[in-house]
């Protein structure tokens, strides 16, 4: 009787869809039973230990990326470099990751894997390259070489290709069902926030604790990198022993997607579908929204040590605490928001984050012109910028996997990662060169980019609409 009931439900859905098709109302449909027990594809998840290692890798990689922020400007000056090099040092890893993105994709998807991604390969590569990078950075003072710092950050950039796989892992249809992609995307952002929070704090704390050291090996500029090298060794060994690879789908039952309207008018859900102009436009707009959000975050983050030094005479340790406290506040906010994502669509989340960034920029410009740039409002603005940028970027890949044909998921994923890598690099260089131009220029560029993102999202708003019906 139960099987007959499920069959009747499926037939009723099929009849409804046939009527719609006859009336000229086009839809993209994949059917599945309404019985949750009969539809494991609606709830399948990746191996717990592997997912935990991917999240932990994300956090520690963000620490490696930002641990130099509080001390980079002083370290460069200590070695005789110019002011602009501080931003280059911060942003160099992501541009390196962008250059190496295609080779890493080939490395992680060999022919023997039959189309599946071997996540262990980029995971292992990120650990090894970070170990080498941190050791080289820590030896730069001994060598009295700014060039060695740059080379060390290039090695860190090899590891930063892993940022692509953090997002891809939690949107891979072979590992995780569509039901969990948005929430796991937010959790991934929370872990990144923890790393972005801990990085400046650890960097400032290690600098303060070793400030009196006269050694060229272990001092305020290098101690944090020695610490991270040891942490990466531990993560490498743990991953080598425990990481579980999935090279086949966890279920043969497909996910259900019923759309009342075309998500992309010229993308048909069949094996012969083409991406088309609208599909390319959707990918571009979603990627650009991620670029504008992360450009703002990285520009602010790189400028905080400089700006607080100019306005409040902050030390590296104080600047690191400033950055870390903002991140600590954001962690519970993002956790709460991860619960609220069940009531919001992906496009709503992206738009909300971009609008919050615009409001923050308008307030900061107003405060700047009134001459009341006290530390408290500046801190609140940076905290909200952190939150807005994090939520604006968190569902980008998840959204593209819902509105694009599966054969184009990788293209969308790579496009988002390219935009983030560019924003990390350009934003960090822009913020690191804060002394070279007026604060008004800084605010204006950040504001214009986010306004453009909102306008672009509104233009294609209907194309981003998707209604999911999960078993």
Curated annotation (Swiss-Prot):
SUPFAM superfamilies: MFS general substrate transporter. GO terms for cellular component: cell division site; cell tip; Golgi apparatus; membrane. Keywords: Golgi apparatus, Membrane, Transmembrane, Transmembrane helix, Transport. GO terms for biological process: transmembrane transport. It is a multi-pass membrane protein. CDD domains: MFS_MFSD8. The chain crosses the membrane at residues 48-68, 85-105, 123-140, 145-165, 186-206, 223-243, 277-297, 320-340, 349-369, 379-399, 414-434, 440-460. GO terms for molecular function: transmembrane transporter activity. This is Uncharacterized MFS-type transporter C757.11c.
């Amino acid at each position: 009787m139960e099987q007959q009931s499920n069959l009747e439900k499926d037939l009723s859905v099929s009849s409804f869809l046939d009527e719609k098709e006859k009336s000229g109302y086009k839809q993209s449909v994949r059917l599945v039973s309404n019985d949750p027990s009969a539809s494991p594809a609606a709830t399948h998840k990746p191996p717990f230990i592997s997912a935990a290692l991917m999240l932990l890798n994300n956090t520690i990689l963000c620490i490696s990326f930002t641990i130099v922020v509080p001390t980079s400007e002083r370290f460069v000056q200590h070695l005789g470099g110019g002011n602009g090099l501080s931003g280059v040092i911060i942003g160099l890893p992501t541009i390196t990751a962008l250059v190496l993105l295609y080779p890493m994709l080939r490395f992680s998807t060999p022919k023997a894997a039959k189309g599946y991604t071997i996540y262990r390969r980029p995971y292992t590569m990120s650990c090894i390259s970070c170990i080498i990078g941190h050791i080289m950075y820590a030896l730069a003072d001994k060598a009295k070489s700014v060039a060695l710092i740059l080379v060390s950050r290039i090695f860190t950039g090899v590891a930063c290709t892993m940022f692509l796989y953090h997002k891809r892992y939690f949107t891979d249809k072979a590992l995780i069902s569509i039901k969990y992609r948005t929430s796991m995307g937010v959790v991934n952002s929370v872990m990144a926030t923890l790393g972005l929070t801990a990085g400046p704090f650890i960097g400032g704390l290690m600098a303060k604790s070793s400030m009196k050291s006269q050694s060229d090996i272990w001092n305020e500029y290098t101690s944090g990198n020695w610490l991270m090298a040891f942490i990466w060794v531990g993560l490498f060994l743990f991953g080598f022993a425990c990481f579980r690879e999935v090279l086949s789908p966890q279920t043969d039952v497909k996910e259900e997607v019923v759309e009342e309207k075309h998500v992309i008018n010229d993308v048909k859900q069949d094996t012969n579908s083409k991406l088309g102009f609208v599909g390319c436009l959707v990918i571009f707009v979603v990627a650009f929204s991620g670029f504008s959000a992360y450009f703002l975050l990285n520009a602010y983050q790189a400028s905080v040590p400089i700006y607080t030094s100019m306005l409040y005479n902050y030390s590296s340790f104080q600047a690191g605490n400033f950055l870390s406290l903002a991140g600590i506040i954001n962690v519970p906010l993002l956790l709460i928001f991860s619960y609220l994502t069940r009531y919001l669509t992906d496009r709503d989340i992206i738009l909300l984050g971009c609008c919050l960034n615009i409001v923050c920029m308008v307030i900061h410009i107003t405060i700047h012109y009134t001459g009341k740039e006290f530390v408290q409002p500046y801190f609140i603005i940076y905290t909200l910028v952190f939150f807005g940028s994090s939520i604006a970027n968190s569902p980008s890949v998840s959204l593209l996997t819902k509105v694009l044909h599966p054969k184009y998921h990788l293209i969308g994923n790579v496009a988002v990662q390219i935009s983030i890598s560019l924003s990390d690099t350009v934003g960090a260089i822009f913020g690191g060169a804060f002394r070279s131009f007026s604060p008004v220029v800084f605010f204006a560029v950040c504001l214009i980019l986010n306004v453009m993102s909102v306008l672009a999202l509104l233009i294609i708003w209907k194309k981003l609409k998707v209604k999911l019906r999960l078993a």
